[in-house]
Amino acid sequence: MAALVLSLLLLSLAGHSSASWCVCKTGLSDTVLQATLDYACGNGADCNPTKPKQSCFNPDNVRSHCNYAVNSFFQKKGQSPGSCNFDGTATPTNSDPSYTGCAFPTSASGSSGSTTVTPGTTNPKGSPTTTTLPGSGTNSPYSGNPTNGVFGGNSTGGTTGTGINPDYTTDSSAFALKNSSKLFICLLLIASSGFCSFLML
């Protein structure tokens, strides 16, 4: 029985640990985050959920919209190396950034409303498209003209950190709960392995 429980715990941990997301780095100005947001939304990210009256619009601040956009871009690129860089403004994470009412996708199929843009044509924003991954060469969030939040960013420099902490500046109760459940599972594994060795005596 203990072996069955241990096997199920290991399987659930293995399945959970494979997920990866992309979020904007903390400590960056709203202007930098807006440029990153605009780049991601203009190059294939599904930013529709960050539009008004959509599931990820609130909290309405640049950081939370940037997080959703870079993650969508990262998933659309198949979590490929370099697709979560954005010239150093984003970073991959294994901690799910989803929050109440806003689920961040973990795969390209998890993003809805995608559009295919043919390289060399114009995208819905009207600027030339590129096939270069963000953070490499001269194609970065800082080349081109930002659209001041057309795809959901708040370019007014509003307060970040509102709502239930989607900007990740401090640990929220959801992260604390997630981390405490990992600790509980680790303790359970240690206790069960000690229990199993005691039974073998």
Curated annotation (Swiss-Prot):
Bilayer topology: Lipid-anchor; GPI-anchor
Something else known: Overexpression of PDCB1 results in callose accumulation and decreased plasmodesmal molecular diffusion.
Pfam families membership: X8
UniProt feature, compositional bias: Gly residues: 150-161
Region (Disordered): 107-164
Protein name per its UniProtKB record: PLASMODESMATA CALLOSE-BINDING PROTEIN 1
GO molecular function list: (1->3)-beta-D-glucan binding; polysaccharide binding
Residue ranges, compositional bias (Low complexity): 107-141
Localisation: Cell membrane; Cell junction, Plasmodesma
Carbohydrate attachment residues: N154, N179
Gene from which this protein is expressed: PDCB1
SMART domains reported for this sequence: X8
Disulfide bonds: C22-C84
Top-level taxon in the UniProt lineage: Eukaryota
Tissue: Expressed in the shoot apical region and in young leaves but also detected in the laminar and vasculature of mature leaves.
Major localization listed first in the record, in broad terms: membrane
An example Gene Ontology CC term for this record: side of membrane
